[in-house]
Amino acid sequence: MAKRKLSKQQKWRIQKIQDERTKRATRKETQLESQLSGGELSAEQEGLIIAHYGQQLAVEALEPPHAGQIFRCYVRANIDSLVTGDLVIWRAGPDNSGVIVARQPRESALKRPDKFGQLKPIAANIDQILIVIAAEPEPHHNLVDRYLVASEAVGIPPLIILNKQDLINDANRDALQQFKDQYQQLGYEWIDASTNTQSGLDDLKQHLAHKTSIFVGQSGVGKSSLIKMLLPEEDVKVGDLSENVRKGTHTTTTAKLFHLPSGGDLIDSPGIREFGLWHIDEHTLEDGFVEFRPHLGHCRFRNCRHIQEPGCALQSAQESGEILTSRMESFLRIRESLQEQDIHEENL
């Protein structure tokens, strides 16, 4: 996919911001090196980034004697961008402060483009993506498929949750069952749930235990209700975190990590809930439809568009029932939308 072309003014602004950050980092680095060399900090230990506040990060200590405590940490300038979910090596200082000296390797990273079109990590070490749909508003293949392709592209297993199960009735029951059957036949896990009746919630909690998860889905499907049910003290925890960590800085809109009372962790932010197809190419899109994979590369023509070309392996698989028509149509619509986005960005 083509990259967004930046104007001279945008390039100048980016460079100016980077220069200012470098100057601040250099000043902070000098102070940190003084603390490190002066023996003012504790021995190195492992920690978990649970939030990001301006130039400081909230790090949860994972080793005694501070295990479970939250520290406000600065970062050494030679460390790449850190995000919520990163495991780090840090050293404790006075007054709940500290210094991050290294980042552990990431198992996974969720990225999205910034306002300049450059991909930036927003969360790390995610184990599963929970795609929330609902009986109302009616779910659509195209939207679910976009989330599934995005999950496949970053290599993070998805789990589909049909929320608002209490709204299933005679008018929509058969269609929803068919919808469910199609994705289960593709090998995707599925949970029926309702925050109103509490059905399916024990099953959901079991899937969340011992994992780090995120919720995605369109507005109105009940993501907030599910999160509030899983985190009944969320507002209190955010307030406590602000008191202990923010120290007058602005309220963050970046991702926060919460420990679920039932086990497991949840990383949440508005940006994460809008997770989607950001800057993927057509090859990645094709590979994101798992049932396409056995047929890719077997078309008669290398530049086959999978529409009406003779010898198209995907069209043949659709005719034989190996690929559902709804999924093929969804693929073509998504590809068209990506092409439109390419054209839009090239004209910026």
UniProtKB/Swiss-Prot annotation:
Pfam families: RsgA_GTPase. Its main location: cytoplasm. It comes from Hahella chejuensis (strain KCTC 2396). One of several proteins that assist in the late maturation steps of the functional core of the 30S ribosomal subunit. Helps release RbfA from mature subunits. May play a role in the assembly of ribosomal proteins into the subunit. Circularly permuted GTPase that catalyzes slow GTP hydrolysis, GTPase activity is stimulated by the 30S ribosomal subunit. Transmembrane segments: none annotated. It comes from the Bacteria. Zn(2+) binds at residues 299, 304, 306, 312. Residues 116-275 form the CP-type G domain. Monomer. Associates with 30S ribosomal subunit, binds 16S rRNA. Belongs to the TRAFAC class YlqF/YawG GTPase family. RsgA subfamily. Gene3D superfamilies: Nucleic acid-binding proteins (2.40.50.140), P-loop containing nucleotide triphosphate hydrolases (3.40.50.300), Probable gtpase engc, domain 3 (1.10.40.50). GO terms for molecular function: GTP binding; GTPase activity; metal ion binding; rRNA binding. Its cofactor is Zn(2+). This is Small ribosomal subunit biogenesis GTPase RsgA. Residues 1-14 have a biased composition (Basic residues). Its EC number is 3.6.1.-. GTP binds at residues 163-166, 217-225. Residues 1-39 are annotated as: Disordered. Signal peptide: none annotated. Residues 16-31 have a biased composition (Basic and acidic residues). Keywords: Cytoplasm, GTP-binding, Hydrolase, Metal-binding, Nucleotide-binding, Ribosome biogenesis, RNA-binding, rRNA-binding, Zinc.
